Amino acid sequence: MLVSISNFPATARPQAGLSFAPYVFEFSITEGQDRFLATFYGQYPEPETPFTGDCEVRTGAFKPTETLLGNRVWLDSNKNGLQDPGENGIGGICVNLYDEQGNLLQTTTTDTNGYYGFNLEKGQIYSLEFVKPANLAFTDRNTGNDNLDSDADPVTGKTTPITIDKDTLSWDAGLYPNDSFVSPTPDIKNGPKPQVGPVRSGRLLYAYIDGFFQNSCLIDAFASPEVLVKIPHCSFVSHEDSGGGSMLEIDRLKAIAEDNMRHMTSRPFNYTSNVFSDEVPTGGLPASQINVFFANLNQSGWSYDPLYQAYLRYVDTADKNNPGVLHADTDRLTGRQLHFENVIVVMADTDVVSPTNLDIHLDEGDGGYAYLFRDGQMIPIKWSTKAGEYEKLTGLRRPIQFLNNDGSPAVLRPGHTWVLIVTPFSLVQVQQPGVYLIRYAAPEGESR
């Protein structure tokens, strides 16, 4: 499913559903504004009222200064002691750090996604204590994979001694509701509603993306006449300016997807065009921060957080009195901060059809330069929609492919990917060590 999601006016934010999208494409819609096309497959978006602990929820990206110790506190819904897909983190859990003699050294808390961390001196021995709320219980510990299981004693919440000789990001704690737990009461008026969006009008770019996500189904809020005849649709929502656009009910999204699937059962498709691995590629340049500038009142940023091994997203408020002041960007469905394992800057040729209508070329057979940000580093790569051996053999298209300069597959980190599309003459600049500026350059004739 492809859904056109608004970013302007600023009342569209925070959007609902972006954290569930394997790929999000961001691009200019002229006049200094941008829009997103979110892909949904493999998992439907769902609203959530998150569990929280008794402590303050930590905010901001974790900044490493020494050797790291940390990871995540999560809700172990099935009580199997392992972090399974769909089991989310718990914010506001206090975590205490002790030295070898049992003296309390530091205290921190988990953030909205359940992550915590400490900067520590290498070669020392420490232990942790997770402080659970009264209505939650610890799951069994050491039930399997060290990166996925719980390490907290089910009675005390404490860990065994930990010797720090390198970054150690595998000390987790699983919690589940005990007999005294009462589910949070949904806030009917202000709580998350089962909707995605806001949904706005279609753009010419969507025809190209729909083409390489074969059997996909595009939903938008109509489009200008010259665009409407060129892009495929399987459904529309009403066009509304208030609140940044109309919201799409998740039940309707599911019904449209199921109807589309019934019509496509005889048509094969394959979305595995890229390579993913936890192993960090060599040769990248440090990139802890990405600053994105479309216009003075349209700025955003990405901060690398080593606890997540992903980039946390930040946005402005389009406030002329406070331009460029960023805050955490969250998903309206969950209240959790958006984080993406891969941020890719794609440089694509752009034609100006009219001052407010761009044709951004991701056509079949195209390609160009790109920049991959993953694991706190930047790697120059290329993008391609050209047919490879698979496409030539089967006649089927696959999604946009990311390649190293020698033509081998660029390796992405498993997880979600944010694709920022800019013109070939946009600025990609190192502002200071580890900090990149992506400044959009409008083609001649684009309304600013």
Regions found by a protein language model. Give the residues of each.
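Short beta-strand/loop motifs in extracellular/secreted proteins, especially
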Residues: 91-95, 124-126, 368
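Short, acidic Ser/Thr/Gly-rich low-complexity loop/linker segments typical of extracellular
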Residues: 75-84, 89-91, 99-115
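Short strand-edge motifs at loop-to-beta-strand transitions and within beta-strands
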Residues: 114-118, 158-160, 169-171
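A surface/extracellular/periplasmic glyco- and lipid-processing/surface-interacting theme
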Residues: 1-25, 29-65, 178-448
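A short, Gly/Thr-enriched small/hydrophobic beta-strand-prone motif that recurs across taxa
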Residues: 64-82, 94, 171-172
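A short, solvent-exposed beta-strand micro-motif common in secreted/extracellular proteins
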Residues: 124-135
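Beta-strand signatures of extracellular beta-sandwich domains
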Residues: 72, 94-98, 127-129
